[in-house]
Amino acid sequence: MSALKKCVAVAALLGLTGTAHSALFHRGGGMVYDSTLDITWLADWNLVGHQMQWATAKDWASNLVHGGYDDWRLPAVVQPDESCSHNSPQPGLLDFKYYGFTCMASEMSHLFYADLGGKTGAAITEQAGDAPQELANLALFCNMQYGVYWYGT
């Protein structure tokens, strides 16, 4: 069974396709719609099957045709982001203003913290203490890999 079919099968099997209170909805075709951000995510977080350098990932995303859409891109980051937990510089260090944990203005950070119940310093697959809706949202995605995910900006 292909990775895409496995993603869809897992979400369908569990019956976790979002509710009226959810920001995430199974869109079919290996896609998940985020109604809060008005963007569509790929359900398979490792669709390519290997890691890429940033420039290669940007080029891949901009040339991707998937689910009838050809306007894919890497997630956007917002800086400065005043929602970050560490929003003031520390003496003697580089200016880290608006960086840190629990940032919510960037697309991927919003997905991680708000929709999937991510916790600072923990893998997204660590689900202890997650609310039922966060568990349902996470079930919409598959093939999550430990490591780096690129932003487009």
Describe the role of every protein-language-model region:
Residues 58-69, 77-153:
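An exposed tryptophan-centered "aromatic clamp" motif
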